[in-house]
C-alpha cells in the first residue's frame, strides 16, 4: 500500500533562498496555508528536510 503525507506551507517564501523557493514549487505549494498530498518516498522526504522550517507534515 502506498503511504501518503499531507504537506502544508506554514511560512512565507519571501526572503528565503532561491533553492528553497524552487523546492516549494516542486512540491506544488504556492501560499501560506496551502496543502498538498504527496506519496511518501525518499525524494519527497529530502525536499521536506530542506524546507522543514516552512512546512508542516502529517502522515495519512
UniProtKB/Swiss-Prot annotation:
<dbReference type="Pfam" id="PF00327">
    <property type="entry name" value="Ribosomal_L30"/>
</dbReference>
<dbReference type="InterPro" id="IPR036919">
    <property type="entry name" value="Ribo_uL30_ferredoxin-like_sf"/>
</dbReference>
<protein>
    <recommendedName>
        <fullName>Large ribosomal subunit protein uL30</fullName>
    </recommendedName>
</protein>
<dbReference type="InterPro" id="IPR016082">
    <property type="entry name" value="Ribosomal_uL30_ferredoxin-like"/>
</dbReference>
<dbReference type="GO" id="GO:0015934">
    <property type="term" value="C:large ribosomal subunit"/>
</dbReference>
<comment type="similarity">
    <text>Belongs to the universal ribosomal protein uL30 family.</text>
</comment>
<dbReference type="GO" id="GO:0006412">
    <property type="term" value="P:translation"/>
</dbReference>
<comment type="subunit">
    <text>Part of the 50S ribosomal subunit.</text>
</comment>
<dbReference type="InterPro" id="IPR018038">
    <property type="entry name" value="Ribosomal_uL30_CS"/>
</dbReference>
<dbReference type="GO" id="GO:0003735">
    <property type="term" value="F:structural constituent of ribosome"/>
</dbReference>
<keyword id="KW-0689">Ribosomal protein</keyword>
<dbReference type="InterPro" id="IPR005996">
    <property type="entry name" value="Ribosomal_uL30_bac-type"/>
</dbReference>
<keyword id="KW-0687">Ribonucleoprotein</keyword>
